[in-house]
């Protein structure tokens, strides 16, 4: 019969899996409590870094419908449950692992799909969501500005031509008249 604290732990882990849009499975062997605290701080408020019991995590993942970590839960495992921007959390893990090589990224899950450790690293190399959105907005604004200039060009050319004619008339020079066409001769059929 399962212990009440294990049942509560499985419920909590299941909720974390369901609330997270991404998760990264790591091995933390050799890291001190102070280093783990430093990692939690580096990951920010939108990421929960939890040291787990593999059996309870396997049960919680099955209950949540997560298959990304099947067969990978062995040894000292911890998962970074990410509810915010996964790029920022992946950068935090990458930067921490550079200074603390004991932290090993095993795999991850992004929006319900399993991703490899290499994919987590590639995710860390992306720019944040806000930066990417601002770049898209900049491209859209530039495109609109170019379109506005394109549509305004014929109008401004016409205005400049009319202004030049006005200045020429004001200077006393007669405006060049358009050539007058002679009326067509009428033919009479007899």
From Swiss-Prot:
One of its GO terms (cellular component) is large ribosomal subunit. InterPro entries: Ribosomal_uL10, Ribosomal_uL10-like_sf, Ribosomal_uL10_bac, Ribosomal_uL10_bac_type, Ribosomal_uL10_CS_bac. One of its GO terms (molecular function) is large ribosomal subunit rRNA binding. It comes from the Bacteria. Keywords: Ribonucleoprotein, Ribosomal protein, RNA-binding, rRNA-binding. GO terms for biological process: translation. SUPFAM superfamilies: Ribosomal protein L10-like. Residues 170-190 are annotated as: Disordered. It holds the Pfam family Ribosomal_L10. HAMAP family: Ribosomal_uL10. Forms part of the ribosomal stalk, playing a central role in the interaction of the ribosome with GTP-bound translation factors. Belongs to the universal ribosomal protein uL10 family. Part of the ribosomal stalk of the 50S ribosomal subunit. The N-terminus interacts with L11 and the large rRNA to form the base of the stalk. The C-terminus forms an elongated spine to which L12 dimers bind in a sequential fashion forming a multimeric L10(L12)X complex. This is Large ribosomal subunit protein uL10. It comes from Kineococcus radiotolerans (strain ATCC BAA-149 / DSM 14245 / SRS30216). The gene is rplJ.
């Amino acid at each position: 019969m399962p212990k009440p604290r294990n049942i509560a732990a499985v419920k909590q882990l299941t909720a974390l899996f369901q609330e997270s849009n991404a998760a990264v499975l790591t091995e933390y062997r050799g890291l001190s409590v102070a280093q783990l605290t430093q990692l939690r701080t580096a990951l920010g408020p939108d990421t929960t870094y939890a040291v787990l019991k593999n059996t309870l995590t396997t049960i919680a993942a099955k209950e949540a419908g997560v298959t990304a970590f099947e067969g990978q839960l062995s040894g000292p495992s911890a998962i970074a449950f990410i509810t915010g921007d996964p790029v920022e959390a992946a950068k935090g893990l990458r930067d921490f692992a550079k200074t603390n090589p004991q932290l090993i990224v095993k795999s991850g899950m992004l929006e319900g799909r399993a991703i490899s450790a290499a994919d987590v690293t590639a995710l860390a190399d992306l720019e944040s969501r806000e930066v990417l959105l601002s770049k898209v907005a900049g491209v859209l604004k530039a495109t609109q500005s170019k379109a506005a200039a394109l549509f305004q060009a014929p109008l401004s050319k016409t205005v400049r031509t009319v202004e030049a004619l006005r200045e020429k008339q004001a200077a006393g020079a007669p405006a060049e008249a358009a050539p007058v066409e002679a009326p067509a001769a009428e033919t009479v059929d007899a």
